[in-house]
């Protein structure tokens, strides 16, 4: 796998010269302000969306449970994703917006740090885990829930600069 490429001129940093996985050594990098934002979309039935907004799901407040789950997941990403570094997460925000016309809930996560590597994975894990928690909170009334479109929207800081999804 030597020279494995994702984009011209960019190598897979988690592979050594023989193609073996390794955790990238970031000890020589400076701590810099970094931020990442991600999203996930949860499709639910119209009845489920109404029950969530009215607060009548038996397990409790769906959005607050999902918010806490997303925050907790961001802080523990290094335990969930192999080769992720443990980071000093300095802030996590999780927001929800319901779209009754599409029977969807959009989850937006924002994660910040002052560290040696980025928080893209933390933002993605936060959004995904919030979506999984919505599923768990609502599965008794809606088995057809779909979690989709988990993706990075924005990242800043570090050597690779800023990325913003168009």
UniProtKB/Swiss-Prot annotation:
Instruction: Fetch the InterPro entries from UniProt.
Output: MoaC (IPR023045), MoaC_bact/euk (IPR047594), MoaC_sf (IPR036522), MoCo_biosynth_MoaA/MoaC (IPR050105), Mopterin_CF_biosynth-C_dom (IPR002820)
Q: Does Lyase count among this protein's keywords?
A: yes
GO molecular function annotations of the record: cyclic pyranopterin monophosphate synthase activity
Could you list this entry's UniProt keywords, alphabetically sorted.
Answer: Lyase, Molybdenum cofactor biosynthesis
Leader peptide range in chain numbering: none
Q: Where does substrate bind?
A: 83-85, 121-122
Q: Its annotated pathway?
A: Cofactor biosynthesis; molybdopterin biosynthesis
Query: Which reaction(s) does its UniProt entry say it catalyses?
Result: (8S)-3',8-cyclo-7,8-dihydroguanosine 5'-triphosphate = cyclic pyranopterin phosphate + diphosphate
EC top class, as a word: lyase
Lyase keyword on record: yes
Pfam families registered for this protein in UniProt = MoaC (PF01967)
Q: What is its EC number?
A: 4.6.1.17
Q: Which GO BP terms, alphabetically?
A: Mo-molybdopterin cofactor biosynthetic process
The entry's active site is: 136
Q: How is the subunit organization of this protein annotated in UniProt? A: Homohexamer; trimer of dimers.
Q: What does this protein do?
A: Catalyzes the conversion of (8S)-3',8-cyclo-7,8-dihydroguanosine 5'-triphosphate to cyclic pyranopterin monophosphate (cPMP).
Q: Which family does it belong to?
A: Belongs to the MoaC family.
| HAMAP family per the UniProt record, alphabetical | MoaC_B (MF_01224_B)
**NCBIfam families attached to this UniProt entry:** moaC, PRK09364.1
Name of the featured protein: Cyclic pyranopterin monophosphate synthase
| Native source organism of the sequence | Syntrophobacter fumaroxidans (strain DSM 10017 / MPOB)
